[in-house]
Amino acid sequence: MNTEKRAVVLACVTLQFDCDRIIKIAKQIADDTDCDLRVLSVLEPTHDYTEAAWQIEYLNMVSKQFGADMTVLFDKNADRAAAEFAKKNNVVRIVTGLHDGGEESFLVGFNILLPEMPLTMVAKDNMVYSMDAVSYTHLRAHETDSYL
């Protein structure tokens, strides 16, 4: 019996209805790479989630339509929570919205915690940008080879 976990593409979404575009692209990537799809949203702890209920339900419904489970975590540090989730769930790529440019953004923090994790960003106009991790050792080897 094979007990090895399948590789996972992780769609990281916020509570916005238009995050369905992220789930859709993540599903395409998962299918193209023979991976499972998971969806994650990390919410800051609060006492009232009334405003978020519709968005959570909608994104969960979209996740189910694409054959994915959606996990909602409650943590003040979304980047740390997502990185820990990625490590525990055999995630091989994350798919998010575009980086907002701030040094304190989710993507900057996540990249510090898991710099080797390939990343795909989906803009609101559905343009897709991907970055694959390249190790420093690999870069140095190419640099050395090019000067021989």
Region locations from a protein language model:
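Aromatic/hydrophobic pocket-lining residues that form π-stacking "cages" and hydrophobic walls in ligand
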Residues: 26, 59, 82, 110, ...
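Structural beta-alpha unit
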Residues: 66-94, 100-102, 109, 116, ...
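Short, charged/polar "capping" segments at the starts of alpha-helices
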Residues: 46-52, 102-104, 129-130
